[in-house]
């Protein structure tokens, strides 16, 4: 049964939205809690494609915005997902699809955190509740999913380059179609966005860029560019329509609607700007405007559509708009999990178990502990203070914490520059985003063998965010770089001590650890320094004189999976008496423990299996193969059967982490099956 947005009754914290009528003015609804039942959305239910919007009046569009916002609230409660950014672009999404003729006109979303409303209006309304789940809708726009998703995204700052490419190709083919790129102020801090804008002016391309300025990326936007946008806002409208007709006469948006800025920026006298960055580089500039005012958006976007050459429309929005808790805490509500079931039975309290730490928390604890001991430690993050576990470090050591915004290339070379002056920089970065700073890692850090440590978070399969965020290529692109040393801890305690080991090393190092919680291992003190390039035999199962001897070489958090798989094989009636198993925690991808490999070969190992949460091609198993084939003395005389277990040569679709592991044969059952095939 559907619930009307006009009649929802408050039932519990998660049960319903605030009861109030949908106005036909531009005063949007604000809801207090997330509805459990599908809301009543008569206007939205009439929209199966953007073409259906053409019959709506402006008043209908305003009312539709409330219905769409409530529907996104409901759907996010069912499936979880990115939240605040989606609520902030409801009106913009409606205005774009009303004015443009998608899919002939091209709409390009940057990052994709804000594309849920776009998915709803483009025929995917009834599947939005499946978003991020296995075989459901993807978390981001994806070309294979819909003709309306013009460019696949997930990383930031790509939209203007992609949109410019579309515009130039359309011009070359003589096709008159509008290309509109939507980019946030956080993504605009990425250098790639400015490279594209510079080229758009050079090419005199017909390109519309919409700057969705909510003073946030995932957390608060920072830096000189963010301050420049604030000055544009506080100085009033800077409307340039010299190529588009008469000046737009409209009121300045209510400052109180965006008073969150006052919490982030020092009050100051603001000059009346006669020019701005966008106009200075050659864009026609409209703005700033209220991004929640549909009539105003329709007027401005209609004019911008008529402009020849590159044009930028600057709008202000509120992240989490219309959901009171998200407006108050936009960082906390950047993304949410699904709501708990109402009928969840209360759990019987047992002896309280200490919760497992997230690996990002382990890193944060190490940072704070080490910073007390060593005043040379400096920490850098490209806009991932919260996600990387650095909030407490930033609070305790603000002068040693550097958030460089979404600028991975800069972050890596910044660390290199710091290292030349006798300090020890640590770059905390997600594996998938380190790819964006690869040239800098090689040219600016490793080539000079500078003393920089990389703390690589979100390594391996990351679950619902899917292939765009998977960290499954780092072993391959790091281990081929001279001077680079790579560690892969099996649990929280080992992560802490490997972080310390790499910190104490003079040179380029990387510690790679996964998303989420660990195994529950207790972190021991004081911090240890492990032997570099030395593995640990975790267990030996089976009879010493068994005819088959398997060495299971596990990297990182796959050690626990390897141990469970080995125990199952040791109990197997078919293999228990015929196979001895060595479970090895390799710890290091580079340098490998080649001494241990030689010892295992000399002991008569008949089978070797490598296990990693990384692509098989180029991964740690490949490193073992290369050593055995090229450098091992023992392997020339004794050649065991070899199996590499890891991620196959394909992008792994979104789903839960456990579903992804099973899909790749990296769950315990999958590993056992592959080992049994090897031993058969």
From Swiss-Prot:
Homodimer. Its cofactor is Mg(2+); thiamine diphosphate. Catalyzes the acyloin condensation reaction between C atoms 2 and 3 of pyruvate and glyceraldehyde 3-phosphate to yield 1-deoxy-D-xylulose-5-phosphate (DXP). One of its GO terms (biological process) is terpenoid biosynthetic process. It catalyses: D-glyceraldehyde 3-phosphate + pyruvate + H(+) = 1-deoxy-D-xylulose 5-phosphate + CO2. Its EC number is 2.2.1.7. It holds the Pfam family Transketolase_C. PANTHER family: 1-D-DEOXYXYLULOSE 5-PHOSPHATE SYNTHASE-RELATED, 1-DEOXY-D-XYLULOSE-5-PHOSPHATE SYNTHASE, CHLOROPLASTIC. Belongs to the transketolase family. DXPS subfamily. SUPFAM superfamilies: Thiamin diphosphate-binding fold (THDP-binding), TK C-terminal domain-like. Thiamine diphosphate binds at residues 113, 154-156, 186-187, 214, 323, 408. This is 1-deoxy-D-xylulose-5-phosphate synthase. Coiled coil: none annotated. One of its GO terms (molecular function) is magnesium ion binding. PROSITE patterns: TRANSKETOLASE_2. One of its GO terms (cellular component) is cytosol. Pathway: Metabolic intermediate biosynthesis; 1-deoxy-D-xylulose 5-phosphate biosynthesis; 1-deoxy-D-xylulose 5-phosphate from D-glyceraldehyde 3-phosphate and pyruvate: step 1/1. It comes from Psychrobacter arcticus (strain DSM 17307 / VKM B-2377 / 273-4). InterPro entries: Dxylulose-5-P_synthase (IPR005477), THDP-binding (IPR029061), Transketo_C/PFOR_II (IPR009014), Transketolase-like_Pyr-bd (IPR005475), Transketolase_BS (IPR020826), Transketolase_C (IPR033248). Keywords: Isoprene biosynthesis, Magnesium, Metal-binding, Thiamine biosynthesis, Thiamine pyrophosphate, Transferase. Mg(2+) binds at residues 185, 214. Binds 1 Mg(2+) ion per subunit.
